[in-house]
Structures are given as structure tokens and as C-alpha cells.
Swiss-Prot record:
Localization annotation: Cytoplasm
UniProt key word S-adenosyl-L-methionine: yes
Record's protein name: Ribosomal protein L11 methyltransferase
Gene Ontology biological-process annotations: methylation
InterPro entries reported in the protein's UniProt record: Ribosomal_L11_MeTrfase_PrmA, Ribosomal_PrmA_MeTrfase, SAM-dependent_MTases_sf
Main location: cytoplasm
CDD domains: AdoMet_MTases
Gene Ontology CC terms: cytosol
Organism per entry: Shewanella denitrificans (strain OS217 / ATCC BAA-1090 / DSM 15013)
Any one GO molecular function term: protein-lysine N-methyltransferase activity
Length: 293
């Protein structure tokens, strides 16, 4: 069935309250969009931040008369008369199919491909990781994930032990195993990430080589030849001593999840333990690599 969509321009202070009013008026869904392409980085744990300029998007059944809803909102001091809004008809679609059609196999480096399960593998003889978008972060489409995948592809991981620190979907851990690593340990603070990583490992038939832990459960003295951490600049700095002690002397490190302007300072901080390389950049993001001293 078709739908009617009401879009309202507001700010982060009023967005939730406006959404509540729209739900009371019969909206079947409420979503929030960025009104001015403003990025939000490193929200607090458990926080769902909104942009200062927020668009509240409400979806109604096609037969809904929105005039009373618009009139009600116009009386609110949050919006006022003649508040900016837009009403449009939304055609009915197979939204699941449209979502699936937006994901394609992607190549990283020279050997590695990430392929959704519903797509034909373009190069069966390549190193292929089968991964579908899901709850946990990491499908290869984000620049930080891409930077880490390209780095892993550039390494000879034969018989190496690897730690994926902040494993998310398990994409980096599974890629490392497919690229020849002997064993990979994934650590994440989110139990959903652990579950997602396990499911993806089973799908790629590498579950026997992948050990997954919440931080409080990881083995004492855990150490590896290669460590990759695609998290955020704040945790990367806070956890630097812990990360450093998990890399053997002469071992390799990759850090991502940080903005270009954060790279230089973080590289200087990690130089206490690592011989750091020049940063690599993709879009607004960066990756740091180094060798353990």
C-alpha cells in the first residue's frame, strides 16, 4: 500500500517531542534525519544523539488526512504557525529487495572480496568473505573498515596470530583468517557483536580458528603477532597501554576509527610503544600502522 510522508524541520531540543505528537496522531513510524549533513562522532555509551538541525519524518497510511495534524502542530510553541514542513506521497515498494539491491561485492586490495550472501561471487578463486549487513558495525562500506581490510590484504598473515580489538561484525577477524592467519581472537564490549561475529564465522567456515570474548572474559596474557583495532580515537588513546601489551615485539599494529585531524596526535602517543608509519587516509578518516618496539 502507498503511504503519506510528513517531513518537519526542527532542532534536537524538540525532535523527540514532535515525534511523540505525530505518533499520537496516528503515524506508523517516526525517523530522524540530519538537516544539514552534520557528522556526529563518538557519542557516549548508550546515547542516541540528534543533530542540531533535525528533520522529523513521519509515515502515515495513504488515506490519512494530515490537515488536522498540521493544524495541531502549528499551535505548538515548538513550531509555530507556518512551520517548515513537506507532505508527499510515497510509492509502495519491496523495501527489503531495494535494501538488498544496494549491497554489492566489494574488492579490497588485490586479493580480498566482501560479498553479500545473496550475490554471486564475482571471483571464486579470490579470497572471499561472505557477510551480510546486520546488527553489528562492519560490512566494508565504511572508510575505516575499508582501510583496515586493505591493510590486512597487504600483509603475509601465514601462520600469524591476530587480535581484532573491537571486532563488531567480525569482518576483520574473518578476513584475517581467510588471508592465512593461523588463529584470530576477537574482543568486543557488546555481546551482540560477539554473537554476530560467531554467526559470520560459521557462515565462512572459520569458527574453529576464531575465539571471541567480552573484555572481562579474555585470557590473561593474550598476545599476538598482529593487532587491528577499528574503534574510535577516544578509546584508542585510553586503551593504548593495554593494546600495546597485546602485540609481540616486532608485531604489527593497525588503528582506525579516527578522523584525519586526530591521526597525528594519536600517532605521537602510540610512538611510545611502536615505530609508527605515516597515516593513510580515506575520505575524512584515517588509519595508523606501526611496528612494536
Amino acid at each position: 500500500m502507498p503511504w503519506i510522508q510528513l517531513r518537519i524541520n526542527t532542532n534536537s531540543d524538540h525532535a523527540d517531542a514532535i515525534g511523540d505528537i505525530l505518533m499520537e496522531q496516528g503515524a506508523v513510524s517516526i525517523t530522524y534525519e540530519d538537516g544539514k549533513d552534520t557528522p556526529i562522532f563518538e557519542p557516549k555509551l548508550g546515547e542516541t544523539p540528534l543533530w542540531q538541525d533535525t528533520v522529523v519524518v513521519a509515515l502515515f497510511d495513504a488515506g490519512t488526512d494530515l490537515a488536522p495534524t498540521v493544524a495541531l502542530l502549528a499551535t505548538s510553541p515548538m513550531l509555530g504557525e507556518n512551520f517548515p514542513h513537506k507532505i508527499e506521497q510515497i510509492e509502495d515498494k519491496d523495501w527489503v529487495r531495494e535494501w538488498m539491491d544496494s549491497f554489492h561485492p566489494i574488492q579490497f586490495g588485490t586479493r580480498l572480496w566482501i560479498c553479500p550472501s545473496w550475490r554471486e561471487i564475482p571471483h571464486p578463486d579470490a579470497v572471499n568473505v561472505i557477510l551480510d549487513p546486520g546488527l553489528a558495525f562492519g560490512t566494508g562500506t565504511h572508510p575505516t573498515t575499508a582501510l583496515c581490510l586493505e591493510w590486512l590484504d597487504s600483509l603475509d598473515l601465514s601462520d600469524e596470530e591476530v587480535i581484532d580489538f573491537g571486532c563488531g561484525s567480525g569482518i576483520l577477524a574473518i578476513a584475517a583468517l581467510k588471508l592465512g592467519a593461523k588463529k584470530v581472537t576477537g574482543v568486543d564490549i557488546d555481546y551482540q557483536a560477539i554473537d554476530a561475529s560467531q554467526a559470520n564465522a560459521v557462515r565462512n567456515n572459520v569458527q574453529d580458528q576464531l575465539a571471541l570474548y567480552l573484555p572481562e572474559d579474555q585470557p590473561e596474557g593474550l598476545i599476538a603477532d598482529v593487532l587491528v583495532a577499528n574503534i574510535l580515537a577516544g578509546p584508542l588513546r585510553e586503551l593504548a597501554p593495554l593494546i600495546a601489551e597485546k602485540v609481540r615485539q616486532g608485531g604489527k599494529l593497525a588503528l582506525s576509527g579516527l578522523l584525519q585531524e586526530q591521526a597525528e596526535e594519536l600517532a605521537e602517543f602510540y610512538s611510545q610503544w611502536f615505530q609508527m608509519d605515516p597515516p593513510a587516509y580515506k575520505d575524512d578518516w584515517s588509519r595508523l600502522t606501526g611496528i612494536r618496539k
